[in-house]
């Protein structure tokens, strides 16, 4: 219904009877509040919380965006210890490692707008990705640890960290929280 209404409006504005359905797709999002409609162009495609690295998940995974936001709200910095005693599929340790290494959130995914060559030439996406890659530094010292009681989910966390490109920055181990100790104080 929304598509039909938009096309009818465009017909009047551009004095055309027909708009061919060729070229790139431009998905629209429509939200209503009382008597107002807000129309937005979806440039991302898949939701932004899907970073592209998490193939395997635990029963109650936290979204990547929420994990990153919570980490950024803490006093944690890359030179400080970070321990997740219930790491599940590794979202908190992986997001912390990505922050520490300067890996941009969208590095491992694609965006719908990348195919819109007429609006934004692909070279600009390449420039942005090159700039983001230049900021990455995985040759850093970190003390990021993830523990979980479930050995299979620890394997999944390791695999997710590998897919994110930060496996060397995180120590994952199967361990119950009752055995959690560390010589460093946070």
Indicate where each model-derived feature is located.
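Short, charged low-complexity intrinsically disordered segments located at boundaries
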Residues: 31-43, 99-102, 123-131, 186
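Local beta-strand N-terminus motif with an aromatic residue
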Residues: 79, 185-186
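Conserved S-adenosyl-L-methionine
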Residues: 62-178
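Sequence-level detector for tyrosine residue identity
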Residues: 14, 53, 124-127, 147, ...
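Short conserved loop adjoining the S-adenosyl-L-methionine
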Residues: 179-184
